[in-house]
Every structure is written in structure tokens, then in C-alpha cells.
């Protein structure tokens, strides 16, 4: 190519460089979507771009970058507030001191969202909560090889979202001191691994509205205590026995409970699980998945007077009696969703007898409108009994949808005809049997 053509192409590029003419706020928003290393590379484009990257409000670094480069990038930052900083650090590459310095710089930049994951085989990184008197921090996400060591209450007055993903804790007091200093906390996610570092994990947060607690640790001595008077949404995945205490949740609207435990003392477990249900009577939406064959008992007179949507996983035989109990105790229930196993069960315990309610529940007579049954087999006798009972007695049912993607089309048609043979209480009910997975 001749020199003349080179000059012509260069002139054409400059004439077509329309992106540089965009408002600075829009350019910064665009740059925020790019990897930080690419954002820094834009400084060579022109004089205008030379310092623009220093104003980008969101930064992300990982262990592939040199610590000096990360430090220089943070120290060069000129935006009034650092909106978000993501750090993925390998402790085999970065020392705990270096990681601590980077976190300290972030606090000095008035960071609003800090995400820190530490990997590697070296000692756990102790998060510097002594630096946490930070009025700007609104979201804090900590994961993996981090230990929470908080000898005295922190001061995180603006923190609204806290996510503790598999981190460790020095002791019970560290949990209390961390949460007690988060006076505006609304969203809390806790993922506990098989750690025996905390005996009583107390979640006492007056402002908390959403809680997701996953407890993979099976330490019999560990206890979870939930005391959150403003809590509206609860998701618990762990052992539903006397190690889980829900003490004060009067505002609870939605709860999802998944029991992954194997109980040694069935009598105690029956009562405790019943007490847990008894503490959820204010909910409007409830999902239950139990793993053990329990004879469910909950306190006499417990009424789910607000419950409009119920989801039950029908993996265990006692779920059917739990269903009877819940129908009797939920007078305004409108939506019922049952979720079965994906594949057919051949174990005889699945064929136990269902004890249907003595009287037709009020919700079936007056309120239930939608039934969804996912992975309906139609071969297990108890399933057929329950399905036919619901169709025969639900006066205002508008739609009943069954599905199973794991049986042949001719079998699905056979199941549908069997269900259609039932004399239904509702004249306007639409009965459907689908192949694909369905949701409410």
C-alpha cells in the first residue's frame, strides 16, 4: 500500500471515530462492561482516552495480573466513588498482606460493592474488618479461603447485602459481632461447608428481609438460630431438626425449606419439624422438600391462614400425609404444585396408603384454582388416589396440569384418559398432560 493510501485510511479512521464523540458518562458505562485489562488498554487510543479509564466505576482483577499493576490501577482511580471492585486472588500467588493492602485501598476509594474470593493452598486470609468503618459499602461478597475474625462489633451502617460463600469463622462471637454492626442489612446469603468452627450460628438481624442459608455441615453440635422480625423471604437448605430454630419471623411471606438430613431420633425430629412448620404460619408461599420418613406433627391449632401457594416434593412416603395436613390447615390455598421423582420408583415404601382428610378441606371447596403435578407417574397407587381425590373435590379448579418427560407418549395418553374418567367437581377445569417440564 502506498503512503498516500495509508494517509487516506488514517484520515478516514479519524473521521469515522464517532465513539469518542459520545458523552463521557456513556463512555464510562460502556467501559464498565469490559475486562479491566482491556479498559486500561484504551488509554493509547487518543488524548481523550488517556485518562478516561481512571474514571471507570467498576473494576475487576484476578490472579493472572501482577499485584503491582493492580495496586497502580487502584491508586490511579479518580472517580469520586468506586462503584464495584471484584478481586479473585490466589494465595499461592498473592500474600495475605498484599490482598489486605488491596482491600484497604478499596475502602479508601469509598467502594460500594466489594467481591473478594481467595483460592489456593496457603493459610486462610483474615478479612481486615478493622478497616470496615466504611460508610459507603453497600454490598460485600466474600468467598472460599477467608476467615471471619471479628473480636468486636463492626460499623457497616450502609451495608444492605452480605454474601458469605463457604468462608470460615473464628468463633460464635465473630458471627454476632459482624451481623450486629450491619444495622441496615436487608439481604443475607450464607453458605456453610463442613466446618465445626461455630457451635451456635445466630442470625439476629432486625432489618433483614431476605435470608438464604445453605448448611452443608453435618456437625451434630452446630445450631442455627434465626431471629429476624422483618424477614419476608427465607430459603433454608440443611438439616431440619433441633439444630434449626426459627424464633421470630412474624413478617415472613415466602419460605422454601429443603431437608437434607438423616434423623437418628424420629420422635424428636417429628416434633421439631412440626415446630418449624408452626413458626411459618404467616407465609403466603411455601415450598417443602423433606428427606426422611417422618410422621409429621405440628402444634395443635396451627393454621396457615395466609397461604395461597404450596409446593411439595413427593420423594418420601410421609409427604402424602403432610399434604393432607397442609390442605386441612390452609383454608385459602389457591395454587398446589407437586414435584415427583424424575424416574419411576420401585421401592414398596412409595406405595404406602394415603390417609385422605376426614372432611373435604375448605381450600378445595372454595379457593384452589391451579394444580401442577410435575413428574407424575400414574403407576404408584398413592399418586392415583391423591390425583383423583383432588379432581373429585376441588369445586373451583380452573386448570390441572400433569407432566412427565420420561414416559412414552402412549403412556401419557393412557394416564390422561384415566384422569379424564374422574367425575370432577369443577365443570370448567382444563385438564392437561404435558411432556415438557412445567412451572406454576
Task: Describe the function of each predicted region.
Residues 56, 82, 111-114, 137, ...:
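Conserved hydrophobic position(s) of the canonical leucine-rich repeat
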Residues 100-105, 128-134, 151-159, 175-183, ...:
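A structural signal for leucine-rich repeat
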Residues 2-5, 10-204, 363, ...:
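Leucine-rich repeat
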Residues 1-4, 405-440:
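C-terminal helix/juxtamembrane-tail motif
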Residues 57-62, 77-92, 109-119, 137-138, ...:
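LRR N-terminal entry segment and analogous cap-like coil->beta motifs
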